[in-house]
């Protein structure tokens, strides 16, 4: 799922991610290597919402430009990301699983939800 999402990166698209705490706690090294580096190489802009208590992970990502990061007091049990027509949902509990949906309308709706969350989050 992640490889398909990452391979869709295009410098004309923007990656939007509302993250879950457990993703950083369990998979930080994976995310930096297999997600951030290809995004930077392709010069794809990212907006990332991180739980405030995990600000140290946001500070690590500031070097992976272009990126904008905001911090939220709301912590979610799952995360979602949008790029182009692709949307993923990742549930990272005891039995992690993910959904990847390719649909323009669905992606457009999730982008709007992300923007509402973005406006509520702080720098």
Language model features: what each stretch is:
Residues 1-27, 36:
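Interdomain hinge/linker segments and adjacent boundary elements that couple functional modules
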Residues 22-123:
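PLD/PLD-like phosphodiesterase catalytic module centered on the HKD motif
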């Amino acid at each position: 799922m992640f490889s398909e999402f990452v391979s869709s990166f295009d410098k004309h698209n923007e990656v939007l991610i509302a993250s879950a705490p457990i993703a950083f706690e369990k998979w930080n090294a994976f995310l930096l290597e297999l997600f951030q580096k290809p995004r930077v190489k392709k010069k794809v802009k990212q907006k990332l919402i991180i739980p405030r208590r995990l600000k140290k992970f946001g500070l690590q990502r500031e070097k992976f430009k272009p990126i904008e990061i905001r911090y939220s007091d709301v912590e979610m049990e799952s995360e979602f990301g949008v790029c182009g027509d692709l949307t993923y949902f990742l549930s990272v509990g005891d039995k992690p699983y993910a959904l990847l949906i390719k649909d323009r309308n669905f992606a457009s709706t999730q982008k709007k939800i992300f923007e509402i969350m973005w406006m509520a989050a702080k720098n």
